[in-house]
A protein has these predicted regions:
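Acidic, proline/glycine-rich low-complexity IDRs
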Residues: 1-17, 73-123
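Long, contiguous N-terminal structural blocks used for assembly/anchoring
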Residues: 1-66
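Extended, compositionally biased
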Residues: 64-74
């Protein structure tokens, strides 16, 4: 099941597809709706420095020492809400210039960024 979410991320407006991890015959779980609510309320802009740091640590040779425009390297395209009962988990999925095959996931729990990783971690 999916829906659209209009969101401003790092001072740029996006219309993102929200994907809920559901079985074909299943409705979206209350825990997934709660996770989306926390994600919408999260201060995603606060993650910018962490994302820049991640990019520099992973690909500093290609980037240099600073990042002026994060969108040269990272572009959000979707929000994924897994089937978890205990944590309110949401992943902001992003295209990543240096790993176009796998992309990048910013994992939020209860509205807080907890991990930046390969999307396989959450999918």
């Amino acid at each position: 099941m999916s829906e659209k979410l209009d969101l401003v991320i790092w001072n740029r407006a996006f219309s993102l597809k929200v994907l809920f991890d559901c079985f074909d015959d299943e409705e979206v779980l209350d825990s997934q709706r709660t996770a989306l609510k926390y994600f919408k309320e999260a201060d995603i802009s606060a993650s910018l420095d962490q994302v820049k740091q991640f990019c520099l640590e992973q690909n500093g040779k290609e980037i240099g020492t600073t990042i002026d425009n994060i969108f040269k390297y990272v572009v959000p395209y979707s929000v994924y809400i897994p089937r978890k009962q205990k944590e309110s988990t949401a992943a902001l999925l992003c295209h990543y210039r240096f790993d176009i095959e796998n992309d990048l996931a910013l994992i939020f729990e209860n509205g807080n960024l907890v991990k930046i990783c390969n999307p396989d971690y959450i999918l």
